[in-house]
């Protein structure tokens, strides 16, 4: 359940970012080229960094990489809300991308760690249901909150949920990476 809720909240960020970030950047008087560049920073950072973070999770474990990644995502959203120009928005987007890269491949690895091959596809399907539901939940939650309270409030709500999701992982999830027992060195 810790992995599924983290997947939902991770994609909730996407639903918010895709819908609200461009509006937020336009409201901050960014031109179309700047908005396009800023919109690309988050997924580009995420895409490149996950090439490394997936392998990193094979060495350091899953739990704390997921929890820390959720917190980095929350910080990235907060930086975007607090920023007043292109450099700050870009920094927040990059942080959101790094945090997402820490979480995205690691969540799937955690499922693979615990699911027996005979039911792995079913467990991945259940996880993907919850994860992908996050897109819709994020778009709806962010949109309704933005309409009622404004763009910054909606973004803070998503940042807070993301931070709490990291806490849920930190407090409830058990480490799923099983390490091979150390082998004795011959002659030692």
What is the predicted role of each segment?
Residues 19-34:
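Short amphipathic helix-loop junctions that connect adjacent transmembrane helices
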Residues 49-61, 146-147:
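Helix-to-loop junctions at the C-terminal end of transmembrane segments
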Residues 76, 87-95:
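Paired small-residue
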Residues 102-115:
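Intracellular juxtamembrane helix-capping segments at the cytosolic ends
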Residues 144-162:
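A membrane-interface helix-boundary motif in multi-pass transporters
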Residues 64-79, 159:
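Structural signature of the two symmetry-related core transmembrane helices
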Residues 43-51, 135-136:
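Residue-level signature of mid-helix packing/kink "hotspots" within the transmembrane helices
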Residues 1-16, 94:
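Pair of pore-lining "gating" transmembrane helices in MFS-fold secondary transporters
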């Amino acid at each position: 359940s810790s992995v599924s809720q983290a997947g939902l909240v991770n994609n909730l960020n996407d639903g918010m970012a895709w819908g609200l970030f461009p509006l937020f950047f336009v409201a901050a008087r960014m031109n179309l080229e700047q908005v396009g560049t800023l919109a690309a920073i988050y997924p580009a950072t995420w895409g490149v960094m996950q090439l490394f973070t997936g392998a990193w999770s094979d060495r350091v474990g899953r739990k704390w990489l997921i929890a820390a990644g959720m917190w980095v995502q929350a910080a990235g959203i907060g930086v975007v809300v607090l920023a007043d120009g292109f450099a700050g928005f870009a920094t927040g987007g990059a942080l959101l991308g790094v945090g997402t890269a820490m979480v995205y491949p690691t969540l799937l690895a955690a499922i693979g760690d615990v699911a027996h091959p005979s039911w792995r596809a079913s467990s991945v399907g259940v996880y993907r249901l919850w994860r992908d539901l996050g897109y819709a939940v994020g778009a709806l939650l962010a949109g309704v909150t933005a309409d009622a309270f404004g763009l910054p409030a909606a973004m803070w709500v998503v940042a807070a949920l993301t931070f709490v999701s990291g806490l849920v992982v930190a407090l409830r999830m058990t480490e799923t990476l099983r390490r091979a027992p150390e082998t004795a060195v011959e002659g030692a």
